[in-house]
């Protein structure tokens, strides 16, 4: 009964986890070079990954061993302010180094809320994450900290985790007003900020909030089912272990030898006194009554075995010094 119940709950746990993981997708790989047409001028590449999805950012290999068309980049994950200005700092750690043109180098992004790795990336629903490169594609400009292909080629990735394309842009992350355009800027700044323009439709906002809340509720239900199933399985395992432990202890007690305390005899072999002579000539040993007394703290582990294996009980008599006449009894 317990074994079948354990299998049932284990099956429920596996099914719940499969339902939760079936939503995970492997997104198309992003090739980081200037020939990739997915980078929209003035906007970059906007993605909508969900929790559990995976995506590779690939530094493509140059075919034929030719050095023509070789591009060198360093990719960084930056906050919104650095995305707008296309800047990085010395404290920023590169996410990916594209410095080996003779082989494919890639970095896999796994969109998970909790990472088992101490240095792993963690993503949260409803938040935006940004990847840019301030390198200009050459080895000399590999360590540039400003501009680069982020500004000239709009090579930047905006990842809206756990969101939908119909969701509005959050006003807390993006400004609601913009400075006027200046003709001397040539429209570069305005183009680079096109992705930052908010959607002003109130109906779209309500729809986006509804989709977002429904997806969050669904994922929470699946997670709760996994946790509940795992908890039930752990409880069943604990109960089974306790039951087996009690059963083992009962068997151990049943097979262990049972010891009993023994009784020792305190004997006083005093002759029966006559009326005049005071001797015991002619008296029989059966006329002497020997009192029995339980000896304190006396333990004989062989007593039960002797009395059970050899017929009549055998008593172990302890020799004691003569005692006072008060302990002597006479047969009348």
UniProtKB/Swiss-Prot annotation:
GO annotation terms (biological process): angioblast cell migration involved in selective angioblast sprouting; anterior/posterior pattern specification; axon guidance; axon target recognition; blood vessel development; blood vessel morphogenesis; cell adhesion; cell migration involved in sprouting angiogenesis
Topology class, membrane: Single-pass type I membrane protein
Glycosylation sites (chain numbering): 20, 33, 136, 211
Predominant cellular place of this UniProt entry's protein: membrane
Residue intervals on the Cytoplasmic side: 247-332
Disulfide bonds: 59-98, 86-150
Extracellular membrane side: 25-225
Motif (PDZ-binding): 330-332
Family, as annotated: Belongs to the ephrin family.
Subunit structure: Binds to the receptor tyrosine kinase ephb4.
Name of the protein described by the UniProt record: Ephrin-B2a
Gene source species: Danio rerio (Zebrafish)
Gene responsible for this protein: efnb2a
């Amino acid at each position: 009964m317990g074994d079948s119940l354990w299998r049932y709950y284990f099956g429920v746990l596996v099914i719940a986890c499969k339902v939760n993981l079936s939503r995970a997708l492997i997104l198309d790989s992003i090739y980081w070079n200037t020939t990739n047409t997915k980078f929209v001028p003035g906007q970059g590449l906007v993605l909508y990954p969900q929790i559990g999805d995976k995506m590779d950012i690939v530094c493509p290999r140059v075919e034929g061993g030719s050095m023509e068309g070789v591009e060198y980049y360093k990719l960084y994950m930056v906050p919104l302010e650095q995305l707008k200005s296309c800047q990085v700092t010395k404290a920023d750690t590169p996410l990916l180094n594209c410095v080996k043109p003779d082989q494919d180098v890639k970095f896999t992004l796994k969109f998970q809320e909790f990472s088992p790795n101490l240095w792993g990336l963690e993503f949260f629903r409803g938040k935006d994450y940004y990847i840019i490169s301030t390198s200009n594609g050459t080895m000399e400009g590999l360590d540039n900290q400003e501009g680069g292909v982020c500004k000239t080629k709009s090579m930047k990735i905006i990842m809206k985790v756990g969101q939908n394309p119909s969701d509005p842009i959050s006003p807390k992350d993006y400004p609601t007003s913009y400075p006027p355009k200046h003709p001397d800027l040539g429209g570069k700044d305005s183009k680079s900020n096109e992705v930052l323009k908010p959607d002003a439709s109130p109906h779209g906002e309500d729809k986006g909030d509804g989709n977002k809340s429904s997806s969050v509720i669904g994922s929470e239900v699946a997670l709760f089912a996994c946790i509940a199933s795992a908890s039930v399985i752990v409880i069943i395992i604990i109960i089974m272990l306790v039951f087996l432990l009690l059963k083992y202890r009962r068997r151990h007690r049943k097979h262990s030898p049972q010891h009993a305390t023994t009784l020792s005899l305190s004997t006083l072999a005093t002759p029966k006194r006559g009326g005049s002579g005071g001797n015991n000539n002619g008296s029989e040993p059966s006329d002497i009554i020997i009192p029995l007394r339980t000896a304190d703290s006396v333990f004989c582990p062989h007593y039960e075995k002797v009395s059970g294996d050899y017929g009549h009980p055998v008593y172990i008599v302890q020799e004691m010094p003569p005692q006072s006449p008060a302990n002597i009894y006479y047969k009348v």
